[in-house]
């Protein structure tokens, strides 16, 4: 499972790719260079 390397607080479509307190991205989001990507 891919883990976020950067703290990804940027929200896209109203949903954070990495909720605060979580170590992994959820909901199909992935963090890439501090950007949220839906895969």
Curated annotation (Swiss-Prot):
Single annotated GO MF: toxin activity
Role noted for this protein: Inhibits voltage-gated calcium channels (Cav) in rat cerebellar granule cells. Has insecticidal activity to crickets (Acheta domesticus). Is not toxic to mice.
Protein name (Swiss-Prot/TrEMBL): Omega-theraphotoxin-Ba1b
GO annotations of cellular component type: extracellular region
Disulfide bond found in the keyword field: yes
UniProt entry keywords in alphabetical sequence: Calcium channel impairing toxin, Disulfide bond, Ion channel impairing toxin, Neurotoxin, Secreted, Toxin, Voltage-gated calcium channel impairing toxin
Additional note from the record: Negative results: does not inhibit insect and mice voltage-gated sodium channels (para/tipE, Nav1.2/SCN2A, Nav1.5/SCN5A).
Organism of provenance: Brachypelma albiceps
Tissue-specific expression: Expressed by the venom gland.
Family designation: Belongs to the neurotoxin 12 (Hwtx-2) family. 06 (TXP1) subfamily.
InterPro entries for the chain: Hwtx-2-like
Any matching Pfam family: Toxin_20
């Amino acid at each position: 499972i891919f883990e976020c390397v950067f703290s990804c607080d940027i929200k896209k479509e109203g949903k954070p790719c990495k909720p605060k307190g979580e170590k992994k991205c959820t909901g199909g989001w992935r963090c890439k260079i501090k950007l949220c990507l839906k895969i």
